[in-house]
Amino acid sequence: MIQHAGLGYRRDLAEDFLSLSENSPICFIEAAPENWLKMGGWARKQFDRVAERLPLALHGLSMSLGGQAPLDTDLIDGIKEMMRRYDCTFFSDHLSYCHDGGHLYDLLPLPFTEEMVHHTARRIREVQDRLGCRIAVENTSYYLHSPLAEMNEVEFLNAVAREADCGIHLDVNNIYVNAVNHGLLSPEAFLKNVDADRVCYIHIAGHDVETPELLIDTHGAAVLPTVWDLLELAYAKLPTIPPTLLERDFNFPPFAELEAEVAKIADYQTRAGKEYRRAA
């Protein structure tokens, strides 16, 4: 089961994961299934060895939950088989679309409308029915706000999760990035109003500061103090402490620095003084 604090698995870090000490703060790993469904060779052997040691969460990149194109049933079936193979009980994907007759290789924002709530929730239910389990949806960073919006971001997230009866995968860094870039919803208001009982998993990551008014969610830097503060606030507002993962995709520092950030997550979890939640 997925619990406590974890770190995203990346091929560049394989040897570090294989060399983890018994007292490492890393309690689980996360991987994008799209990167591994057809992967073989030495990289797959290393991944398998790490997945034997640590519980695995799957976080998708290309389900296109809000898209108009039919859902990719081959992808869903591949994820289901990967979950079976690795005894994985958790899958999440982004509340976005990324497919329009072909993969767009980006996570594009959805208009916050009632129509899109119903459309996206229906597709999430289809995914859950085919996988045979509940999934979670993640709030994404976005850089263009639709003029069609009928509600704010957290209202949209709550409405989709409620209608689909799915979990919420809360990305704390994305909350902060969107608040700065758009000025529409403060991070504090987001955390106050999110459906706390549905929050079952958390991401935290670093971002790039292009200008004081433009932040880019890159996962390529250390977590900034303002985002750590939001994580602490999230733990204070949630009824239990969800599994929380540090995302780092490139510009890798020495592995000890990543472990130190994961240890900081674990410290915040302990200080919150609440029951730990398992992602399932």
UniProtKB/Swiss-Prot annotation:
Family annotation (NCBIfam families): PRK05409.1
The family this protein is said to belong to: Belongs to the UPF0276 family.
Organism: Neisseria meningitidis serogroup C (strain 053442)
Name of the featured protein: UPF0276 protein NMCC_2101
InterPro entries, A to Z: MbnB/TglH/ChrH, Xyl_isomerase-like_sf
PANTHER family cross-referenced by the UniProt entry: UPF0276 PROTEIN HI_1600
Domain of life, source organism: Bacteria
